[in-house]
Protein backbone atom coordinates (compact mmCIF):
# COMPACT_ATOMS: atom_id res chain seq x y z
CA UNK A 1 0.00 0.00 0.00
CA UNK A 2 2.96 2.34 0.57
CA UNK A 3 4.01 2.05 -3.08
CA UNK A 4 0.45 2.88 -4.15
CA UNK A 5 0.38 5.89 -1.86
CA UNK A 6 3.66 7.11 -3.35
CA UNK A 7 2.04 6.86 -6.79
CA UNK A 8 -1.05 8.76 -5.61
CA UNK A 9 -3.31 5.72 -5.78
CA UNK A 10 -5.91 5.48 -2.98
CA UNK A 11 -5.69 2.49 -0.64
CA UNK A 12 -7.74 -0.43 -1.87
CA UNK A 13 -7.75 0.67 -5.51
CA UNK A 14 -6.19 -1.80 -7.93
CA UNK A 15 -3.42 -0.99 -10.39
CA UNK A 16 -2.83 -2.65 -13.74
CA UNK A 17 0.58 -2.06 -15.29
CA UNK A 18 0.94 -2.46 -19.05
CA UNK A 19 4.58 -2.52 -20.19
CA UNK A 20 6.03 -3.89 -23.43
CA UNK A 21 9.75 -3.12 -23.39
CA UNK A 22 11.74 0.10 -23.55
CA UNK A 23 11.03 0.65 -27.24
CA UNK A 24 7.42 -0.50 -26.92
CA UNK A 25 5.46 -2.96 -29.05
CA UNK A 26 3.51 -1.65 -32.02
CA UNK A 27 0.70 -4.20 -31.92
CA UNK A 28 0.14 -3.87 -28.18
CA UNK A 29 0.15 -0.09 -28.38
CA UNK A 30 -2.53 -0.33 -31.07
CA UNK A 31 -4.62 -2.56 -28.80
CA UNK A 32 -4.11 -0.23 -25.82
CA UNK A 33 -4.96 2.81 -27.97
CA UNK A 34 -8.34 1.15 -28.58
CA UNK A 35 -8.75 -0.05 -24.98
CA UNK A 36 -7.98 3.19 -23.12
CA UNK A 37 -10.97 5.15 -24.52
CA UNK A 38 -13.22 2.33 -23.20
CA UNK A 39 -12.25 3.24 -19.62
CA UNK A 40 -14.73 5.66 -18.07
CA UNK A 41 -13.32 5.94 -14.56
CA UNK A 42 -15.81 3.37 -13.24
CA UNK A 43 -13.80 0.34 -14.31
CA UNK A 44 -12.60 -0.32 -10.76
CA UNK A 45 -8.86 -0.05 -11.42
CA UNK A 46 -6.12 2.33 -12.47
CA UNK A 47 -4.07 1.68 -15.59
CA UNK A 48 -0.46 2.69 -16.11
CA UNK A 49 0.64 2.08 -19.70
CA UNK A 50 4.22 2.51 -20.90
CA UNK A 51 4.15 3.06 -24.66
CA UNK A 52 7.92 2.94 -25.22
CA UNK A 53 10.16 5.54 -26.82
CA UNK A 54 9.27 4.55 -30.38
CA UNK A 55 5.50 4.93 -29.95
CA UNK A 56 4.86 7.37 -27.11
CA UNK A 57 4.45 10.62 -29.08
CA UNK A 58 2.04 9.15 -31.62
CA UNK A 59 0.02 7.35 -28.98
CA UNK A 60 -0.23 10.45 -26.79
CA UNK A 61 -1.43 12.48 -29.76
CA UNK A 62 -4.04 9.90 -30.76
CA UNK A 63 -5.33 9.48 -27.18
CA UNK A 64 -5.48 13.25 -26.84
CA UNK A 65 -8.25 13.04 -29.44
CA UNK A 66 -9.97 9.78 -28.47
CA UNK A 67 -9.52 9.83 -24.67
CA UNK A 68 -8.91 13.45 -23.61
CA UNK A 69 -10.18 12.66 -20.08
CA UNK A 70 -8.00 9.59 -19.59
CA UNK A 71 -6.19 11.00 -16.54
CA UNK A 72 -9.53 11.65 -14.82
CA UNK A 73 -10.55 8.11 -15.79
CA UNK A 74 -7.62 6.53 -13.97
CA UNK A 75 -5.22 6.16 -16.89
CA UNK A 76 -1.60 7.26 -16.89
CA UNK A 77 0.36 7.11 -20.15
CA UNK A 78 4.14 7.14 -19.89
CA UNK A 79 6.93 6.81 -22.39
CA UNK A 80 8.96 4.71 -19.98
CA UNK A 81 8.70 3.59 -16.36
CA UNK A 82 11.71 5.03 -14.56
CA UNK A 83 10.48 4.04 -11.10
CA UNK A 84 9.93 0.38 -11.98
CA UNK A 85 10.49 -1.08 -8.48
CA UNK A 86 7.80 1.19 -7.00
CA UNK A 87 5.38 0.63 -9.88
CA UNK A 88 5.78 -3.15 -9.85
CA UNK A 89 5.41 -3.26 -6.07
CA UNK A 90 2.12 -1.38 -6.42
CA UNK A 91 0.83 -3.48 -9.34
CA UNK A 92 -2.03 -5.92 -8.78
CA UNK A 93 -1.83 -7.23 -12.34
CA UNK A 94 0.82 -6.83 -15.03
CA UNK A 95 0.44 -7.08 -18.80
CA UNK A 96 3.70 -7.65 -20.67
CA UNK A 97 5.90 -9.74 -22.97
CA UNK A 98 7.65 -12.93 -21.85
CA UNK A 99 11.34 -12.12 -21.99
CA UNK A 100 13.50 -13.98 -19.49
CA UNK A 101 14.44 -10.93 -17.40
CA UNK A 102 10.87 -9.68 -17.23
CA UNK A 103 9.38 -12.98 -16.13
CA UNK A 104 12.20 -13.57 -13.64
CA UNK A 105 11.39 -10.26 -11.96
CA UNK A 106 7.65 -10.97 -12.00
CA UNK A 107 8.19 -14.39 -10.42
CA UNK A 108 10.44 -12.91 -7.74
CA UNK A 109 7.77 -10.30 -6.93
CA UNK A 110 4.87 -12.76 -7.22
CA UNK A 111 2.90 -10.68 -9.73
CA UNK A 112 -0.11 -12.13 -11.55
CA UNK A 113 0.36 -11.53 -15.25
CA UNK A 114 -1.36 -11.46 -18.61
CA UNK A 115 1.39 -12.31 -21.07
CA UNK A 116 1.40 -11.64 -24.79
CA UNK A 117 4.58 -13.32 -26.06
CA UNK A 118 6.42 -11.52 -28.83
CA UNK A 119 6.06 -13.48 -32.07
CA UNK A 120 9.23 -11.82 -33.40
CA UNK A 121 11.82 -13.81 -31.45
CA UNK A 122 14.12 -16.75 -32.16
CA UNK A 123 12.55 -20.21 -31.81
CA UNK A 124 9.37 -18.71 -30.33
CA UNK A 125 11.10 -18.73 -26.93
CA UNK A 126 8.76 -16.14 -25.40
CA UNK A 127 5.72 -18.35 -25.87
CA UNK A 128 7.65 -21.24 -24.33
CA UNK A 129 8.52 -19.04 -21.34
CA UNK A 130 4.91 -17.91 -21.02
CA UNK A 131 3.52 -21.46 -21.16
CA UNK A 132 5.65 -22.44 -18.14
CA UNK A 133 4.04 -19.63 -16.12
CA UNK A 134 0.61 -20.57 -17.43
CA UNK A 135 1.06 -24.25 -16.54
CA UNK A 136 2.00 -23.26 -12.99
CA UNK A 137 -1.14 -21.10 -12.71
CA UNK A 138 0.56 -17.71 -12.55
CA UNK A 139 -0.25 -16.33 -15.98
CA UNK A 140 -2.93 -15.98 -18.59
CA UNK A 141 -1.34 -16.27 -22.04
CA UNK A 142 -2.78 -14.46 -25.04
CA UNK A 143 -1.29 -14.71 -28.52
CA UNK A 144 -1.04 -11.68 -30.78
CA UNK A 145 -3.83 -11.59 -33.32
CA UNK A 146 -6.10 -13.81 -31.21
CA UNK A 147 -7.66 -11.04 -29.10
CA UNK A 148 -8.77 -7.44 -29.35
CA UNK A 149 -9.08 -4.50 -26.97
CA UNK A 150 -12.56 -5.51 -25.83
CA UNK A 151 -11.63 -9.10 -25.00
CA UNK A 152 -8.41 -7.99 -23.27
CA UNK A 153 -10.38 -5.56 -21.11
CA UNK A 154 -12.82 -8.35 -20.25
CA UNK A 155 -9.91 -10.58 -19.19
CA UNK A 156 -8.47 -7.82 -17.00
CA UNK A 157 -11.81 -7.16 -15.31
CA UNK A 158 -12.44 -10.88 -14.77
CA UNK A 159 -9.08 -11.38 -13.05
CA UNK A 160 -9.32 -8.23 -10.93
CA UNK A 161 -12.80 -9.23 -9.74
CA UNK A 162 -11.46 -12.47 -8.24
CA UNK A 163 -9.11 -11.76 -5.32
CA UNK A 164 -8.67 -15.47 -4.61
CA UNK A 165 -7.58 -16.08 -8.20
CA UNK A 166 -5.08 -13.21 -7.98
CA UNK A 167 -3.68 -14.63 -4.72
CA UNK A 168 -3.35 -18.07 -6.29
CA UNK A 169 -1.63 -16.61 -9.36
CA UNK A 170 0.73 -14.65 -7.12
CA UNK A 171 1.64 -17.77 -5.15
CA UNK A 172 2.20 -19.70 -8.38
CA UNK A 173 4.53 -17.00 -9.70
CA UNK A 174 6.48 -16.91 -6.43
CA UNK A 175 6.86 -20.70 -6.53
CA UNK A 176 8.78 -20.34 -9.80
CA UNK A 177 11.21 -17.71 -8.52
CA UNK A 178 14.89 -18.64 -8.39
CA UNK A 179 15.86 -16.37 -5.52
CA UNK A 180 19.40 -17.72 -5.47
CA UNK A 181 19.97 -17.32 -9.22
CA UNK A 182 22.96 -15.00 -8.82
CA UNK A 183 24.71 -17.40 -6.47
CA UNK A 184 23.99 -20.36 -8.74
CA UNK A 185 25.30 -18.56 -11.83
CA UNK A 186 28.44 -17.45 -9.99
CA UNK A 187 28.94 -21.02 -8.78
CA UNK A 188 28.77 -22.36 -12.33
CA UNK A 189 31.25 -19.73 -13.52
CA UNK A 190 33.67 -20.50 -10.69
CA UNK A 191 33.37 -24.26 -11.29
CA UNK A 192 34.10 -23.71 -14.98
CA UNK A 193 37.14 -21.55 -14.21
CA UNK A 194 38.54 -24.10 -11.75
CA UNK A 195 38.11 -26.96 -14.23
CA UNK A 196 40.31 -25.16 -16.73
Regions found by a protein language model. Give the residues of each.
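Short histidine/acidic/glycine/proline-rich micro-motifs that form metal-
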Residues: 22-25, 54, 118-122, 175
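Amphipathic alpha-helical segments at domain termini/boundaries
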Residues: 134-141, 150-159, 169-172
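A ubiquitous structural signal for well-ordered alpha-helices
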Residues: 35, 62, 155, 169-172, ...
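Short, amphipathic alpha-helical "lid/cap" segments that border enzyme active or binding sites
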Residues: 33, 149-153, 182-190
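A short, well-ordered alpha-helix in the C-terminal region of glycosyltransferases
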Residues: 5, 165-179
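A donor-sugar binding/catalytic signature common to diverse glycosyltransferases
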Residues: 84-126
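C-terminal alpha-helical cap of glycosyltransferases
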Residues: 158, 178-196
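Donor-nucleotide binding loops and adjacent catalytic segments primarily
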Residues: 7-94, 127-130, 135, 142-151
Amino acid sequence: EQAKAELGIPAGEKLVVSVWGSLGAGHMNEVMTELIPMLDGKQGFRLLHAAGSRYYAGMAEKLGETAPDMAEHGVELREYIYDMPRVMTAADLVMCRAGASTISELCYMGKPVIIVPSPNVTNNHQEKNARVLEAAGGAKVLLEGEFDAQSLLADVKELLADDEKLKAMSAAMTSLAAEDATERICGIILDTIHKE
